[in-house]
């Protein structure tokens, strides 16, 4: 605790870091405030059916990412997910389309063009998702619209308001990245997830302590122990890397010698991160979408696929997560390109020939890392369902695993590392080191 307080003091002493933290808090507060502003013409008291619909499936994922704005028909209801979807599409295009591959290799100018295309695609997705959201709102909560207002005339301005709200969130995220601390888009998603935690925790405590005579207190303690263990395991494994040694040939320029030092390529255990879970959840949502717009009787198999606690649902879910982990790792890490870059810079892996042998070696290492990584991601993905077996409330069970846990762990670690780097630049230690002012030795080391 003393170390934490000392780190906060150090953060306040560094003027640039203090300003960045205050800007980050200001923009996140603006985002949370906007999440409570309901669309004009909507009666928030009539949104019960929409909120019950977001209790499971992809709807719950969207509601979680938006911090409850989705189920509250807020101006920020669509959240940052359209931009995330556009970014994923652009990542896939950068692998499959030569034009976007070329842009990636053009450095800063290419990155700006890709960002421009991403924004254009985001706007296109918004003008598809916004009417879809409003149509679903009309189906689930038709009484929510104020009397005297026609849904037909409400749709057009509401579509533009929802689109503008999402683009404003994107602007907030970019300002946090530029002038604040951490990745702004990731922080906004994390804030949306954390916003649901207090209510979920209170509901879980209430449900357990009403059954205190039947062992509710013991089960609650067991839940907290399991949650702590899963979070610790997630932190350790998300930070896990395999360091592949790379030796660079020596070069002599004038009287100076360059190269010759051994460096490392860090291959992460979770190269795909949270993306396989998002892809798998999107596919598992398809049966629910079919049932919602179908009037026929639902088959028993489809009923099992609609129940996220059934054995069939979770088996299919695990297979999809593992498959998407291999797929996403394959498209984001290119061993052939890595081997070519290494050869171009006169680098080589000790004991491995440059070129094709190096590419094969890197691919073998990646395959060995992807298998345990995919299994752990699959385990994390079904942890909320396993928590349900302990009668954990669904709202609190989401924090036992799945997308929410991996995002929280990743964003918190990334933000702490950025704060740490700001402190070290001013010769302070932070949470990851001892909390004191660095002396001359620290300056020399840096």
What does each model-found stretch correspond to?
Residues 1-104, 109-446:
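N-terminal cationic and glycine-rich segments that engage phosphates or anionic surfaces
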């Amino acid at each position: 605790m003393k170390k934490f307080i000392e780190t906060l003091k150090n953060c306040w002493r560094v003027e640039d870091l203090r300003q960045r933290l205050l800007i980050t808090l200001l923009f996140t507060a603006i985002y949370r405030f906007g999440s409570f502003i309901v669309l004009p013409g909507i009666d928030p008291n009539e949104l019960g059916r929409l909120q019950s619909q977001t209790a499971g499936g992809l709807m719950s994922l969207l509601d979680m990412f938006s911090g409850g704005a989705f189920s509250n028909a807020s101006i920020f209801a669509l959240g940052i997910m359209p931009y995330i979807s556009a970014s994923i599409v652009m990542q896939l295009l950068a692998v499959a389309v030569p034009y976007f591959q070329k842009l990636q290799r053009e450095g800063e100018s290419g990155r700006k063009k890709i960002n421009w295309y991403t924004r254009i695609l985001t706007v296109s997705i918004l003008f598809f998702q916004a009417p879809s959201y409003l149509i679903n709102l009309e189906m689930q909560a038709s009484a929510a619209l104020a009397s005297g207002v026609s849904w037909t005339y409400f749709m057009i301005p509401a579509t533009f308001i929802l689109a503008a709200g999402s683009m404003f969130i994107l602007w907030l995220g970019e300002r946090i990245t530029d002038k604040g601390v951490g990745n702004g888009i990731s922080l906004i998603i994390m804030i949306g997830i954390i916003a649901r935690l207090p209510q979920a925790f209170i509901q879980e405590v209430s449900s357990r302590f009403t059954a205190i005579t039947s062992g509710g207190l013991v089960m609650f303690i067991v839940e907290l122990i399991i949650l702590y263990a899963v979070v610790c395991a997630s932190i350790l494994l998300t930070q896990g890397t395999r360091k592949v040694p790379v030796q660079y040939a020596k070069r002599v320029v004038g009287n100076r010698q360059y190269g010759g030092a051994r460096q490392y390529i860090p291959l992460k255990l979770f190269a795909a991160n949270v993306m396989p879970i998002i892809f798998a959840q999107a596919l598992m949502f398809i049966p629910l979408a079919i049932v919602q717009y179908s009037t026929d009787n639902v088959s028993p198999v489809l009923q099992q696929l609609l129940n996220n606690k059934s054995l069939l649902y979770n088996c299919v879910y695990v297979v999809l997560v593992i498959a998407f982990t291999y797929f996403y790792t394959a498209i984001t890490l290119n061993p052939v390109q890595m081997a070519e870059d290494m050869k171009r810079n006169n680098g080589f892996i000790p004991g491995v020939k440059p070129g094709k042998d190096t590419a094969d070696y890197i691919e073998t290492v990646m395959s060995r890392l992807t298998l345990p990584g995919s299994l752990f991601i699959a385990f994390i993905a079904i942890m909320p369902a396993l928590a349900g077996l302990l009668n954990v409330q669904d709202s609190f069970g989401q924090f036992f695993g799945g997308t929410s846990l991996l995002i929280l762990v990743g964003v918190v670690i990334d933000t702490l590392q950025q704060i740490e780097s700001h402190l070290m630049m001013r010769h302070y230690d932070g949470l990851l080191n001892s909390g004191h002012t660095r002396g001359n030795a620290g300056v020399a080391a840096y």
